[in-house]
Amino acid sequence: MGIVEPGCGDMLTGTEPMPGSDEGRAPGADPQHRYFYPEPGAQDADERRGGGSLGSPYPGGALVPAPPSRFLGAYAYPPRPQAAGFPGAGESFPPPADAEGYQPGEGYAAPDPRAGLYPGPREDYALPAGLEVSGKLRVALNNHLLWSKFNQHQTEMIITKQGRRMFPFLSFTVAGLEPTSHYRMFVDVVLVDQHHWRYQSGKWVQCGKAEGSMPGNRLYVHPDSPNTGAHWMRQEVSFGKLKLTNNKGASNNVTQMIVLQSLHKYQPRLHIVEVNDGEPEAACNASNTHIFTFQETQFIAVTAYQNAEITQLKIDNNPFAKGFRENFESMYTSVDTSIPSPPGPNCQFLGGDHYSPLLPNQYPVPSRFYPDLPGQAKDVVPQAYWLGAPRDHSYEAEFRAVSMKPAFLPSAPGPTMSYYRGQEVLAPGAGWPVAPQYPPKMGPASWFRPMRTLPMEPGPGGSEGRGPEDQGPPLVWTEIAPIRPESSDSGLGEGDSKRRRVSPYPSSGDSSSPAGAPSPFDKEAEGQFYNYFPN
């Protein structure tokens, strides 16, 4: 705001246009639109602008324009004249005659004249959240809002033997550095208090004294240190690679990990150190070191999350945890929604979306696999073969969550299956042949398969001289002679005589035969045995 030009006096009610002459200016005042309180004898009462009509804090106060400032408005009242004997800027202007022994009135605090007209920020001015000032340097916490969310529930940080990165991590924006000077930036972690903490009844409480100082690294230097001020100010200063560990004897990547104790509260701090030429980096003087602390970055070191709210915040905001959650949900929710439920209890649940190239029927009836099961409904319409795999089909996997790519199956000729008679080998591009659903009717003894027999020949008349009572238990089942399926006879008598030939007991009077042991080849046993396999 500059000087009010003549003719614009109607801008402020009750004031006169400000003269453009040098009358009324205090001697020695700079011409940069800055005005001081005029001497009482320099002008009459009509030229004393303000006159209390605009609410001047004292009689005769004038509302004067002020240059643009960060803390004061465009118009401000000049300082009240001070009593004689004040050193500094007040001595340049003689006080009024009636100002001897003047004391500031109640409710008005006179500024220190030694500080000048604009001494600095007001006492009631507070820095915005997430901003810290040290000298000329200003540092802002970039993810301040995220840290504040965690701080409402007391932030927890996982520490492991291998080291775990912080989330939220520390990220800053720095301003006020000398572009050509070199600076070194690092973060250290210090204890907030001398207490041991425990999560109890849904909140963190103090329990006992903190343990002694644990040996280990407590400092993490930014990889870009040292560097120029222009380098630090043109980009984000991130400490995302900082890891926290509880391994006291950590030797690998010791410069990237900070050793902490579990169930202790810590406060990270940012250090900015100006590095002079020829000065070792380890030297840190108080004159060239600036420390910035943000209260919302306090955390408690834990080996496992204690508060469920913190766990949920980590899942919702951590990009790695969020990706894991999306993959987990897509693997299970997509299958449940895309594949319908079976239409009935007799249907077998097979994923048609995933296996449609191999199984054309999504819900095959179990009677197709077990035709003789009682209580199973028969298929009304004959279905085509489903055991033969079609050629030149790709496995269209739909597990997109695990990033699986479709794999093309080789088109090698499949083995013939003798179970279905008359099956034709499908050529590429050929249609599926229609065949009966059930296998052809087999003979009565088709269930029996030839087995290996002993190389022994029966003697002449062996089968006619022995009765059923002379039989004994066979040595093993593999010694039973095979029954030829092409014979029209059922083979019961022949099988009976051959089983008597291989009996280890030659007669019933032999003492080596077990007494009173029932023979497994009596008539009742034979009836039960052959009734199990109906013709």
From Swiss-Prot:
The modification Phosphotyrosine is found at Y77, Y118, Y220, Y266, Y305, Y530. Residues 503-520 have a biased composition (Low complexity). This is T-box transcription factor TBX21. GO terms for biological process: cell fate specification; lymphocyte migration; negative regulation of DNA-templated transcription; negative regulation of interleukin-2 production; negative regulation of T-helper 17 cell differentiation; negative regulation of T-helper 17 cell lineage commitment; negative regulation of T-helper 2 cell cytokine production; negative regulation of transcription by RNA polymerase II. Residues 141-326 bind DNA. The modification Phosphoserine is found at S53, S225, S513. The record marks Y305 as: Essential for its interaction with RUNX1 and its ability to inhibit RUNX1 transcriptional activity and suppress TH17 lineage development. It is linked to Asthma, with nasal polyps and aspirin intolerance: A condition consisting of asthma, aspirin sensitivity and nasal polyposis. Nasal polyposis is due to chronic inflammation of the paranasal sinus mucosa, leading to protrusion of edematous polyps into the nasal cavities. Immunodeficiency 88: An autosomal recessive disorder characterized by the development of disseminated mycobacterial disease following vaccination with BCG. Clinical features included fever, lymphadenopathy, and cutaneous eruption. Phosphorylations at Ser-53, Tyr-77, Ser-225 and Ser-513 are regulated by mTORC1. Phosphorylation at Tyr-530 is essential for its interaction GATA3. Phosphorylation at Tyr-220, Tyr-266 and Tyr-305 enhances its transcriptional activator activity. Phosphorylation at Thr-303 is required for its interaction with NFATC2. Ubiquitinated at Lys-314, leading to its degradation by the proteasome. Ubiquitination is essential for controlling protein stability, binding to the T-box-binding element of the IFN-gamma promoter, and for interaction with NFATC2 through induction of phosphorylation at Thr-303. Deubiquitinated by USP10 leading to its stabilization. The keyword Phosphoprotein applies. SMART domains: TBOX. Interacts with RUNX1, RUNX3, ITK, ABL1, RELA, CDK9 and KDM6B. The phosphorylated form (at Thr-303) interacts with NFATC2. Interacts with SMARCA4 in a KDM6B-dependent manner. Interacts with CCTN1. Interacts with USP10. The phosphorylated form (at Tyr-530) interacts with GATA3. GO terms for cellular component: chromatin; neuronal cell body; nucleus. It comes from Homo sapiens (Human). InterPro entries: p53-like_TF_DNA-bd_sf (IPR008967), T-box_DNA-bd (IPR046360), T-box_sf (IPR036960), TF_T-box (IPR001699), TF_T-box_CS (IPR018186). It is found in: Nucleus. Residues 1-62, 83-109, 449-535 are annotated as: Disordered. The lineage of its organism: Eukaryota, Metazoa, Chordata, Craniata, Vertebrata. Transmembrane segments: none annotated. Keywords: Activator, Asthma, Disease variant, DNA-binding, Isopeptide bond, Nucleus, Phosphoprotein, Repressor, Transcription, Transcription regulation, Ubl conjugation. T-cell specific. PANTHER family: T-BOX PROTEIN-RELATED, T-BOX TRANSCRIPTION FACTOR TBX21. It holds the Pfam family T-box. Lineage-defining transcription factor which initiates Th1 lineage development from naive Th precursor cells both by activating Th1 genetic programs and by repressing the opposing Th2 and Th17 genetic programs. Activates transcription of a set of genes important for Th1 cell function, including those encoding IFN-gamma and the chemokine receptor CXCR3. Induces permissive chromatin accessibilty and CpG methylation in IFNG. The modification Phosphothreonine is found at T303. There is a cross-link at K314 (Glycyl lysine isopeptide (Lys-Gly) (interchain with G-Cter in ubiquitin)).
